[in-house]
């Protein structure tokens, strides 16, 4: 509790509104509430988060662990991004029922499509448990033993904290281990697909427009949460009924204007706002360039096949989008960090930090922090780069190698946990890979393998390369693997895993694809991971002390905890920006812009005929504005990955937009937030309603919602 009090006492209530930051919703009273009201907010902090009555937090569930969603009707209807629902849409798609291309709309509840393993998680309460988690930790000197004690305490408090039988407890760390918070949650496992526009709307602009502005993408999809007859979470059942939410968001028909207040709630995944300059230099100069080059090579191969074959396009659409998303983000991030002189600004802060350490007489506690950071980042860099090559080539972007690595992990389970654990893992692996092989094409992956293994062998630090990557003729090596390995089709894969543990391990050891993966994984496990983890543990300990020092030495600064996939609030205004000299981007776009980008037959910029007809007839209904149809808008809200699908609400708490991206120039906000160029991109809710109503003819979904005119009161 003392860190909560310290955190609140650190700040002087400011009369001038500020922006930026990802704030814990249970701690908004005081500085944050004052700032938001100065920006124009009309509701209170208690309206945003409360355990005593319904609040906005009850309408913002975590969507499948990686995105955000919002409840928009009293019947459990939720809204998220098209790209967040993409896997579900793809899984229900086939050549005969191509929902990716044509869209999908359930015209009655009986038509809504169930989705195995898709969950949404609601927050019931947020509780500080710092004292319980850090009990008995201060006297421990070993960093490893300290973390073990913390984990032991987390296990205890998770098990003992009061909750209902259908609820779950989860503890997360904040401020680099200086604060711990327990979330009581409800996880709903019956989530059904209700509607999704065609990809020509939901992914309009695709990879060319990704991370950029102006934008004209209708990036949304709709699902419905189902519960048992007690309104509690339950596995899928035909007897389940639509979930009755504690709160749902009214939808504004009045739209936005520049300088309007906006607030975004969601589950941002990861930020690193308090890194030292040495870490930022490593990102800009070492790790980002390596990851960008690897993914660019994989994307080039996949794109070539997808443009020639529609079946491959369906198979690889979601995978391609996933690879491209962070490839482009890393490019923009690196450019933004350079443009904003983030390294130089960090260095200036570090000079000031050292002076404050001396002035406060804290040399013994904090005097060597920066020198130690420099030492350890210098030591860890070759290991970090090697780690990225292994993860990007083997674990993530070459499918045969990724599958082989799962078998490697299976073998390790047998070695460390025995045959029963092996059998359990094996059965789960066989079952889960059915979907993998449905969307796997060996010809495509062989070419990806050829390109990426060549990069691994020629660009990764030479001192950490295994023998299997030395002196390899890549164009001959790839066919020799793919023509002989049993990891290229489901039937052979299942046969490979038939039998007891010893029989399976013997069979996979003889597979050429697995043998190659094992050589890479053994090398990584022996020569890279241990030393990386050892140094990284020291860096993490330094970062925790560095964070504590900043909280102590900068009591009047706006310090918020880095994102960690927990519910946060960020606020700002609808605002345009200037990316470069003589250019200013307006904060709103219209359907006119999509038509201007229209390229008939192009997979990125084609437009459905019906949408063109609606545009030509200006048939916008109640969703138009001065004869035009709003599509997207931008704001100064501080967002990141995980905020996809987040609701953007107005001053009264009404839904005005759906967050789905950031502008390319500002993607470095994960590391360095610059309010002059950092903008989040949102779909205007009027465009969402227009597509549902006028384009899809799903008026019944509109009728479920509460449409309001807050500006006309």
Curated annotation (Swiss-Prot):
This is Asp/Glu-specific dipeptidyl-peptidase. The keyword Signal applies. One of its GO terms (molecular function) is serine-type aminopeptidase activity. It comes from the Bacteria. The lineage of its organism: Bacteria, Pseudomonadati, Bacteroidota, Flavobacteriia, Flavobacteriales. The record marks 662 as: Is essential for the Asp/Glu P1 specificity of DPP11. The keyword Signal applies. The gene is dpp11. Residues 1-17 form the signal peptide. It comes from Flavobacterium psychrophilum (strain ATCC 49511 / DSM 21280 / CIP 103535 / JIP02/86). Its EC number is 3.4.14.-. It is an enzyme of class 3 (hydrolase). The active site is at 83 (charge relay system), 219 (charge relay system), 644 (charge relay system). InterPro entries: Pep_S46, Peptidase_S1_PA. Pfam families: Peptidase_S46. Catalyzes the removal of dipeptides from the N-terminus of oligopeptides. Shows a strict specificity for acidic residues (Asp or Glu) in the P1 position, and has probably a hydrophobic residue preference at the P2 position. Preferentially cleaves the synthetic substrate Leu-Asp-methylcoumaryl-7-amide (Leu-Asp-MCA) as compared to Leu-Glu-MCA. Belongs to the peptidase S46 family. Keywords: Aminopeptidase, Hydrolase, Protease, Serine protease, Signal. GO terms for biological process: peptide catabolic process; proteolysis.
């Amino acid at each position: 509790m003392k860190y909560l009090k310290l955190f609140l006492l650190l700040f002087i209530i400011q009369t001038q509104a500020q922006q930026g930051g990802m704030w814990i919703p249970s701690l908004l009273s005081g500085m944050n509430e004052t700032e938001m009201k100065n920006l124009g907010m009309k509701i209170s902090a208690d309206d945003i988060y409360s355990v005593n009555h319904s609040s906005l937090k009850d309408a913002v569930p975590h969507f499948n662990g990686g995105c955000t969603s919002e409840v928009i009707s009293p019947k459990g209807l939720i809204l998220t991004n098209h790209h967040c629902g993409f896997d579900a849409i793809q899984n229900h798609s086939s050549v005969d029922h191509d929902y990716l291309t044509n869209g999908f709309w359930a015209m009655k509840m009986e038509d809504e499509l169930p989705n195995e393993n898709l969950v949404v998680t609601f927050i019931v309460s947020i509780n500080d448990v710092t004292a319980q988690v850090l009990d008995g930790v201060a006297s421990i000197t070993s960093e490893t033993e300290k973390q073990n004690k913390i984990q032991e305490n987390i296990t205890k408090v998770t098990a003992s904290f009061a909750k209902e039988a259908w609820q779950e407890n989860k503890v997360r760390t904040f401020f680099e281990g200086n604060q711990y918070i327990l979330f009581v949650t409800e996880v709903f496992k019956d989530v059904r697909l209700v509607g999704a526009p065609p990809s020509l709307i939901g992914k309009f602009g695709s990879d060319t427009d990704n991370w950029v502005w102006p934008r004209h993408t209708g990036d949304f999809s709709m699902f419905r949460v189902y519960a048992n007859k007690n309104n509690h979470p339950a596995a899928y059942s035909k007897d389940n009924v639509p979930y009755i939410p504690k709160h749902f968001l009214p939808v504004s028909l009045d739209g936005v204007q520049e300088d309007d207040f906006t607030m975004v709630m969601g589950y941002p995944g990861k930020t690193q706002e308090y890194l030292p300059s040495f870490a930022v230099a490593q990102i800009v100069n070492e790790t980002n360039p390596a990851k960008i080059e690897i993914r660019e090579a994989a994307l080039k191969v996949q794109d070539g096949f997808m443009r020639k074959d529609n079946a491959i396009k369906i198979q690889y659409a979601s995978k391609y989008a996933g690879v491209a998303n962070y490839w482009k983000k890393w490019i923009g991030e690196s450019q933004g960090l350079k443009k904003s002189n983030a390294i130089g600004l960090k260095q200036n802060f570090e000079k000031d930090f050292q002076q404050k350490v001396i002035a406060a007489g804290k040399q013994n506690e904090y005097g060597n922090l920066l020198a130690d950071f420099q030492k350890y980042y210098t030591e860890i860099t070759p290991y970090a780069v090697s780690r990225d090559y292994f993860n990007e080539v083997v674990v993530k972007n070459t499918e045969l190698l990724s599958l082989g690595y799962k078998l490697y992990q299976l073998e390790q389970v047998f070695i460390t946990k025995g045959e029963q654990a092996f059998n359990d893992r094996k059965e789960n692996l066989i079952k889960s890979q059915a979907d993998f092989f449905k969307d796997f094409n060996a010809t495509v992956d062989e070419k990806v393998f050829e390109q990426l293994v060549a990069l691994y062998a020629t660009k990764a630090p030479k001192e950490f390369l295994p023998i299997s990557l030395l002196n390899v003729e890549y164009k001959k090596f790839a066919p020799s693997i793919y023509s002989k390995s049993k990891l290229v089709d489901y039937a052979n894969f299942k046969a490979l895993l038939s039998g007891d543990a010893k029989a399976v391990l013997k069979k996979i050891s003889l597979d050429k694809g697995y043998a190659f993966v094992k050589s890479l994984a053994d090398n990584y496990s022996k020569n890279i991971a241990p030393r990386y983890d050892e140094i990284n543990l020291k860096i993490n300990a330094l970062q925790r002390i560095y964070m504590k020092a900043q909280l102590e030495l900068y009591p009047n600064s706006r310090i918020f905890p880095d994102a960690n996939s927990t519910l946060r609030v960020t606020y700002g205004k609808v605002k345009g920006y200037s990316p470069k000299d003589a250019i200013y981007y307006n904060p709103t776009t219209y359907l006119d812009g999509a038509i201007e980008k229209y390229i008939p037959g192009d997979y990125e910029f084609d437009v459905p005929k019906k949408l063109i007809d609606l545009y030509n007839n200006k048939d916008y209904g109640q969703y138009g504005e001065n004869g035009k149809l709003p599509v997207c808008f931008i704001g100064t809200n501080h967002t990141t990955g995980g905020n996809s699908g987040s609701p953007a609400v107005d001053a009264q708490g009404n839904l005005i937009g759906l967050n789905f991206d950031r502008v390319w120039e500002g993607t470095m906000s994960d590391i360095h937030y610059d309010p002059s160029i950092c903008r989040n991109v949102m779909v205007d809710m009027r465009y969402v309603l227009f597509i549902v109503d006028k384009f899809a003819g799903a008026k019944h979904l509109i009728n479920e919602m509460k449409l309001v005119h807050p500006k006309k009161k």
